[in-house]
Regions:
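PLP-dependent amino-acid enzyme catalytic core
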Residues: 1-115
Length: 115
């Protein structure tokens, strides 16, 4: 698989002002256990508590004005729902989030907080 670092740079420029720069940490115990240098990206510290915000923000930032004027729709029972709602709020775009009846109550409440 080839990575196009230009595309990664373009994506980063689109989202950098809308996301939290989360820390990258290492752990000596894990490193010794695996005999490797391992890093953890603490996306649980992201605005919505997960990495999903990066993708949702990038997608919403990439939409045409026609699509933006119509708003966005997402179906999710959790982190993606929160990410789309938050990203739409940040860009002042209408978002309709559909969640299953059995979605965790905390996820429903957190998503509603974003409008």
């Amino acid at each position: 698989m080839n990575f196009d670092f230009k595309k990664i740079e373009i994506a980063y420029k689109k989202i950098k002002d809308s996301i939290t720069k989360t820390p990258l940490v290492s752990n000596d115990y894990i490193n010794n256990l695996l005999d490797a240098e391992v890093y953890f990206k603490l996306e649980n510290l992201q605005n919505t508590g997960s990495f999903k915000l990066r993708g949702a923000t990038h997608k919403i930032s990439s939409l045409s004005s026609d699509v933006i004027n119509n708003g966005v729709v997402a179906y999710s029972s959790g982190n993606h729902a929160q990410a789309v709602a938050y990203a739409a709020l940040q860009k002042n775009i209408s978002a309709k989030i559909i969640m299953p009846k059995n979605a965790p109550k905390i996820k429903i409440e957190n998503t509603k907080e974003y409008g």
